[in-house]
Curated annotation (Swiss-Prot):
Biological processes annotated in GO: isopentenyl diphosphate biosynthetic process, methylerythritol 4-phosphate pathway involved in terpenoid biosynthetic process
The protein's name in its UniProt record: 1-deoxy-D-xylulose 5-phosphate reductoisomerase
Organism annotation: Paraburkholderia phymatum (strain DSM 17167 / CIP 108236 / LMG 21445 / STM815)
InterPro entries assigned to the protein according to its UniProt record, in alphabetical order: DXP_reductoisomerase, DXP_reductoisomerase_C, DXP_reductoisomerase_N, DXPR_C, DXPR_C_sf, NAD(P)-bd_dom_sf
Gene from which the chain derives: dxr
Binding site for 1-deoxy-D-xylulose 5-phosphate: 126, 152-153, 179, 202, 215, 220-221, 224
Binding-site list for Mn(2+): 151, 153, 224
């Protein structure tokens, strides 16, 4: 039987890779809905190719333009817009599988709607778990949803863990690998001069601009530690980060008997996407086989928290609990956007996040409203802090010494 997919964030990097895998297996997958924010032209191209029943965009103007182009091409895809439309296609009876690939906090509510509707969820939107934590996981468990991680690291951990959760007691710790990004060996003092284009040039992975910056600051790895805590029900002190520049080993699980299991593969997101789409089966992803002899050498090192203060901030937020992780994520989104638009320098990203975490009171997250309120407060605080920075400080100051 074909799986019927809603793809949230189809025009982004994960969306592209997902559709590449889907196109290789038309007998297995049917695209029910595609969603984008404002990239209407690309969404039209995708709709003409995959003929979904529904397309969703962020606003009425984009919806009108997309609908007109689809009608002119004879495509019968219905077009909707706005946050509620995202929720609707995520919980619709028209799909059984939701690929959650919207970047940032905007992906939380549709992902949560999919969980409450008992869908099979392929989670690429780590922010959903970072922000809502137990609220999201409770929705998954209470409604019989199936949660499959798409992030390469978490997908690797999932593959290395025993299928039966009762056997997870033999797990000693999990180890998330990180490439170290484009600035792993760069002199720390020179990081104040980093440009957005430099930060977006990842040495191994093809990603969108926001996640590329997060990789460069290693905030992405920090968010992944928080995500792993919720996905695999392990405390932060049993989740390690290991720098692995080649991005061949995607993560590892260490067991009580001294065994360590690892998942390896070429650095291409189509591999974890194909695994999650077809699970428990295996299908062709379009990714070439790994040639270890050609790679010849794999290297590892501990993360440098002085060079990567954002990683330390994420660890701090996880330890504090409550809404701290939601505030961390929100402040980081605002700071990264300010960096990409050249309002602040690269090293000021961590400064903004640290200031927001220190300025806002923490509290327990007992409802989605608590999470949304913390997110909004952190965004306001981040904007205010950036607006109050002297021009020089915006470029040079560091957050964590």
């Amino acid at each position: 039987m074909q799986k019927r997919l809603t793809l949230l964030g189809s025009t982004g990097s994960i969306g592209d890779s997902t559709l590449d895998v889907v196109a290789r297996h038309p007998d297995r997958f049917f695209v029910y809905a595609l969603t984008a924010h404002r990239n209407g032209d690309k969404l039209v191209e995708q709709c003409l190719r995959f003929q979904p029943e529904v397309a969703v965009v962020g606003d009425a103007d984009t919806a009108a333009k997309v609908a007109a182009k689809l009608r002119a091409a004879g495509c019968k895809t219905a077009v909707a817009y706005g946050p509620q439309a995202l929720v609707d296609v995520s919980k619709s009876d028209g799909c059984d599988t939701v690929v959650a690939a919207i970047v940032g906090a905007a992906g939380l509510e549709p992902s949560l709607a999919a969980a409450r509707a008992g869908k099979r969820i392929l989670l690429a939107n780590k922010e959903a778990l970072v922000m809502s934590g137990s609220i999201f996981m409770d929705a998954v468990h209470d409604n019989g949803a199936i949660l499959l991680p798409v992030d390469s690291e978490h997908n690797a951990i999932f593959q290395c863990l025993p299928r039966e959760s009762a056997l997870h007691g033999g797990v000693s710790k999990i180890i998330l690998t990180a490439s170290g990004g484009p600035f792993r060996t760069r002199e720390p003092a020179s990081l104040v001069d980093v440009t957005p284009d430099e930060a977006c040039k990842h040495p191994n992975w093809v990603m969108g601009r926001k996640i590329s910056v997060d990789s460069a600051t290693m905030m992405n790895k920090g968010l992944e530690v928080i995500e792993a805590h919720w996905l695999f029900n392990l405390p932060g002190d049993r989740i390690d980060v290991l720098i692995h520049p080649q991005s061949v080993i995607h993560s590892l699980v260490s067991y009580a008997d001294g065994s360590v299991l690892a998942q390896l593969g070429n650095p291409d997101m189509r591999t974890p996407i194909a695994h999650a789409l077809a699970f428990p089966d295996r299908v062709d992803s379009g990714v070439g086989q790994l040639d270890l002899a050609q790679i010849a050498q794999l290297s590892f090192e501990k993360p440098d928290y002085t060079r990567f203060p954002c990683l330390a901030l994420a660890m701090k937020a996880l330890a504090e609990g409550g809404v701290a992780s939601a505030a961390l994520n929100a402040a980081n989104e605002i700071a990264v956007e300010a960096f990409l638009t050249r309002r602040i320098g690269f090293m000021a990203i961590a400064q903004v996040v640290d200031a927001v975490l220190n300025s806002l009171p923490n509290r327990e997250a007992t409802s989605l409203a608590d999470v949304v309120d913390a997110d909004a407060a952190a965004r306001r605080a981040a904007h205010a802090y950036i607006d109050g920075l002297p021009a020089g400080a915006r470029l040079t100051e560091r957050a964590v010494q």
